Amino acid sequence: MIFDEDSNSVTQDSGYMTVGNAYSNAVGYISMSDHWSKLTKPSSIKVESNGASPNKADLIVEPLESGFALTLGNALRRVMMSSLRGFAVYGVEIENVLHEFTSISGVREDVTDILLNISMMRVKLSGLSNKVLSLRVKGPCEVRSGMIPDTDDCIILNKDLLICTLDQDVDFNIKMYVNSGKGYVPAVKRKSVSKLSDVPVNFIATNALYSPIKKASFKVESSRIGQFTDYDRLVLSVETDGSILPDEAVALAARILQDQFQPFINFDETDEPHKKIDTKDALPYDSNLLRKVDELELSVRSYNCLKNDNITYIGDLVQKTESDMLRTPNFGRKSLNEINELLASMNLHLGMKIANWPPESIESLSKQYSEE
């Protein structure tokens, strides 16, 4: 390998490779948008129910560039667990109780146990940021969260939660203060604030867990586009408390990340030099539609099925429905999945309607696209 100071170049002495001033001409112009637009993006996000509850679901995202499933999965999970806002009970008033280190006559649990139970109560407010819930019960009975009546602006999500047990014929009167927030706020932190606020003398702060996410995990699997298997599939498993749906939680986490990343983008995309509009841009069809199906990395069985059905161009293929394809002789579910994945990688799908197809002189148009 020889370094030439005059030409500012490095030449491999075997003659197979030259790196120098001519390198940029060989590579060509790279636009700013190429850095993100050339990457493979997920064609769809599939939501699969995980059990009978609508609060549990798996979100399957594919295809992703290699390594992106781990990057995105970890970021989305951490944001969901830490930063989504929800509702929680942050304090209570219990009749004839001045502090948490006491017991109530006729009540099996002491006040600390009652506060612990109440901290697990899940609430959803609509159109409000805070509310006071009141409950009056006469024993003997079990006091459960479902005894608090639902209203138009407040719903108790876990109605079977045990608050306390009344063993005798006693009255149990309690007020619960609900507000919105994020993360976990311990009672100790709330007490320091309540001293400065106008709160009742018998107000008792509780630990408040605002996060609407009960569980969130992810796993990374392999995905494929045609014959290429070096892509990622991200499977996000999310369980919420019922105040939001799992796919809504993921969408909110993605929006938070988008907002946090925005300050790092220190350029204006409108400043990018305008590219010369070539003939390819002026033509009315997506270039992929004018490609022939024999250019795709299809299995022999799938290709022969398309050929026997007189499907020559991708534009012919995408206008077929899944039912049409499955009626093709020797064409099975495996071939259908293969074609769906390939079309998805080009942002196409079966069952599309394309006006004025096929175009006149389709052969020359296809050749023009392939040359460019």
Curated annotation (Swiss-Prot):
Q: Which domain of life is it from?
A: Bacteria
Q: Which UniProt keywords apply?
A: DNA-directed RNA polymerase, Nucleotidyltransferase, Transcription, Transferase
SMART domains assigned: RPOLD
The kind of enzyme this is, by top-level EC class, is transferase
Name the reaction it catalyses. RNA(n) + a ribonucleoside 5'-triphosphate = RNA(n+1) + diphosphate
Q: Name one GO cellular component term.
A: DNA-directed RNA polymerase complex
The processes (GO biological process) annotated in the record are: DNA-templated transcription
What family is this?
A: Belongs to the RNA polymerase alpha chain family.
Q: What is this protein called?
A: DNA-directed RNA polymerase subunit alpha
